[in-house]
């Protein structure tokens, strides 16, 4: 192999490898909760998630819409509960909501249309 070929090859490898170092992956939710089970039950799956302060939870509409997430004001102040809540209804499969939790504590939430059916969950923030 010629010296020129090796120099070009080394340069190409350097350029290509720099792309992998400079591209950061998109931030993902630290926990994902299905709104409605795969079998169609009116539940959050899992019903309790544990995360660290500063992390986020993503709720994804799975089955039997519409769903939303409303945080109860017990154990957290009403302003925080309102900021974390997503009262708009998700109708389409795959539609999602995300909330970031900055303070440690236990946060209870429910699906407004299905609360009476027991669609309630918890986020524990350490």
Swiss-Prot record:
Molecular function GO labels: copper ion binding; electron transfer activity
Predominant place of localization: membrane
Binding site for Cu cation: 67, 111, 114, 119
Coiled-coil regions, chain positions: none
Required cofactor names: Cu(2+)
Its membrane topology: Peripheral membrane protein
Keywords: Copper, Electron transport, Membrane, Metal-binding, Signal, Thylakoid, Transport
Entry-linked SUPFAM superfamilies: Cupredoxins
Residues spanning the signal sequence: 1-28
Keyword hit for Electron transport: yes
Pfam families cross-referenced by the UniProt entry: Copper-bind (PF00127)
Compartments (UniProt record): Cellular thylakoid membrane
Induction, as annotated: By copper.
Keyword Kinase: no
Gene Ontology cellular component annotations, sorted alphabetically: plasma membrane-derived thylakoid membrane
Family note: Belongs to the plastocyanin family.
Function: Participates in electron transfer between P700 and the cytochrome b6-f complex in photosystem I.
PANTHER family (UniProt xref): PLASTOCYANIN MAJOR ISOFORM, CHLOROPLASTIC-RELATED
Protein name: Plastocyanin
Species annotation: Synechocystis sp. (strain ATCC 27184 / PCC 6803 / Kazusa)
Gene name of the record: petE
């Amino acid at each position: 192999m010629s010296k020129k070929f090796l120099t070009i090859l080394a340069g190409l490898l350097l350029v290509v490898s720099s792309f992998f170092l400079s591209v950061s992956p998109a931030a993902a939710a630290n926990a994902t909760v299905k709104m409605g089970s795969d079998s169609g039950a009116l539940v959050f799956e899992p019903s309790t998630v544990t995360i660290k302060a500063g992390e986020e939870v993503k709720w994804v509409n799975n089955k039997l819409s519409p769903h939303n997430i409303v945080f109860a004001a017990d154990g957290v102040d009403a302003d925080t509960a309102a900021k974390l809540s997503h009262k708009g209804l998700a109708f389409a499969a795959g539609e999602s909501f995300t909330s970031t939790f900055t303070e440690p504590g236990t946060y209870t939430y429910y699906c407004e249309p299905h609360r009476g059916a027991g669609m309630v969950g918890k986020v524990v923030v350490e």
